[in-house]
Amino acid sequence: MQQHPMPDSLPGAAFWEALGWTPEPAQLGQLKALQDLLRSWNSRVNLTRLVEGDDYWINQVFDSLWPLQTELRSPHQSRLAIDVGTGGGFPGLAVAIAMPGARMTLLDSVGRKTAAVQAMVNDLGLSDRVSVRTDRIESAGHDRTLRGGFDLAMARAVAAAPVVAEYLVPLLKPDGNALLYRGQWGDTDLRQLKRALVPLNAQLSSSQHCQLPAERGVRHLIRLQPVSPCPRQFPRAVGVPSRQPLGG
């Protein structure tokens, strides 16, 4: 993708062209309102430092949405999606705004963050199709209401790829996709991930990369798909996936 410097205020047409998706006026208003809400909540809860200018529009909005260019071609299609480790609400809130057909679950283990995100969901008028849950993913992955129920499961800046795979794969429908948002990515990362996918009964379906606008760095997206049902023992008990990563 070509690089497009950001203006001081709202993004221009070149920004959205680079993203491959242009918001409706109401969606742009929601994205701006989300920025204002983040500013307000950051004074009470440390959600994110990426709130102003390029930090928000590129490192939050653009970085949340570019991996979903395929899905953004049919934004009103009914989908069930989950954002694991949502933190301050990304990528989940940006995805919910951009894809009106999606029903989103935003999951995080830190109660003060989920309380802030729930308040933002309410203020943005998204509570009819966005739910916020406070839980550890190792526990949530065994919940009958979540396990095997999602078309899309995504995680950004959560843990190493083999760990994230163990978190996300059990949540997928048989034809679902896990989206691993990655920064640096190389051959060693790929080998470790492929080894981790074997016991999960999953496979790597695609990988792609993107140069963020304004020379904000390169990002990678790794998509995973189930091959057969994920064994019931995954995800393992709280803390085990990160201490003893699959494929290590």
Swiss-Prot record:
Keyword Cytoplasm: yes
Domain of life: Bacteria
Location in the cell: Cytoplasm
Binding site for S-adenosyl-L-methionine: 85, 90, 137-138, 156
Pfam families assigned to the protein according to its UniProt record, in alphabetical order: GidB (PF02527)
GO cellular component terms, A-Z: cytosol
EC supergroup of this enzyme: transferase
Keyword tags: Cytoplasm, Methyltransferase, rRNA processing, S-adenosyl-L-methionine, Transferase
Principal localisation: cytoplasm
A GO molecular-function annotation: rRNA (guanine-N7-)-methyltransferase activity
The protein's Enzyme Commission number: 2.1.1.-
UniProt similarity note: Belongs to the methyltransferase superfamily. RNA methyltransferase RsmG family.
Function: Specifically methylates the N7 position of a guanine in 16S rRNA.
Name used for this protein in its record: Ribosomal RNA small subunit methyltransferase G
Organism: Parasynechococcus marenigrum (strain WH8102)
